Amino acid sequence: MTKINIILHEPEIPQNTGNIARTCAATGAALHIIRPMGFEIDDKKLKRAGLDYGHQLDITYYDDLADFNAKHPNACIYYFSTKAPRAYTEISYGGDNVYLMFGKETRGLPEELLHDHPDTTVRIPMRDKLRSLNLSNSVAIAVYEVLRQHAFEGLREDGELTRFSWNEG
């Protein structure tokens, strides 16, 4: 089974990080947060947005990008940026571990990082003259593309009605 790893590089907005944590809990993805952050981890907004799922969340913090790289030296990372040369759908996300990195809300990922990884830098297409999508929305789009490519492995396949049955005519 493929393990999805979401990497947030210096996130700034607690609500976004909380929503991303909730997406990770719902999909079984691991969350990696690279400091510095623009908020304290006990921020009420962060908890309200998603960290009440903390018991179902695999989360790790790193002092900086060098710390992350030292602990994951062989990670194949896909860098998400509005500046990328190709769409995220042009990639086949294979392997046992898939790492998806997203930058801070105000500036994205450092350009030198993108420049050093042209083959694994991707974007989510959107209309011209818009700066970017919301970070938590971008993460959800990317996570579900990886899951789709792996036939939603490990996720519940059907839903249930509370007052009715799908089998009733």
What spans do the regions from the language model cover?
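Post-transcriptional modification and biogenesis factors for structured RNAs
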Residues: 1-169
